[in-house]
Regions:
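Structural alpha/beta core scaffold segments of enzyme domains
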Residues: 1-173
Length: 173
């Protein structure tokens, strides 16, 4: 949900549901072509998004602000729940290919792991998610020999985004 209301001169006030007001402010500023200090983002309350409203709510906020700037009237955008579920990104899918080295006693001596991550049509928060997955690739094991590679894959699907765990669950072995 986003409600954009024109202020004085080119100022814009946007009430939106976001976990990252600064990113929404930057997005609205860029779309309207106005300085960041002319954009005010207000968030009444936020909870339960688990990362899902960190970046993707900026699109709705910017769209409402653009319509409000063009019409010089307040504009509210509220997506139907099923539309919101289709448009909003989900947890990143990963595909793994690996080779594990084991000694004669059954101890893991090393791993060679490739992680391919479906990012979607734009990067969004994919670099951070992939970085976190790579950091968790060895999980709780001491592995004397490790090679981890991560590949963010651009696809024709909706952009995936932050989601509870932010790459850690995908990266754990």
């Amino acid at each position: 949900i986003a409600l954009a209301q024109p202020g004085e001169e080119t100022d814009m006030i946007v009430y939106c549901s976001t976990q990252h007001p600064t990113e929404a402010q930057h997005g609205v500023s860029k779309v309207l072509g106005i300085p960041i200090n002319e954009v005010t983002i207000e968030v009444r309350r936020m909870g339960g998004a688990f990362g899902g409203k960190e970046s993707q709510s900026t699109i709705i906020a910017a769209a409402a602000a653009l319509a409000a700037a063009k019409t010089k009237r307040p504009v509210k955008i509220r997506l139907r729940r099923d539309d919101d579920m289709v448009i909003t990104g989900k947890r990143h899918d990963f595909e793994f290919k690996y080779v594990v080295g084991i000694d004669d006693d059954g101890r893991i001596e090393g791993i060679d792991l490739d992680m391919a991550m479906r990012s979607g049509n734009v990067a969004d928060l994919s670099p951070g998610v992939l970085g976190r997955a790579l950091c968790h690739g060895d999980n709780c094991y001491y592995l004397p020999n490790v090679r981890l590679n991560g590949y963010p894959c651009k696809t024709n699907t909706v952009s995936n985004t932050a989601f509870r765990g932010f790459g850690a669950p995908q990266g754990m072995l």
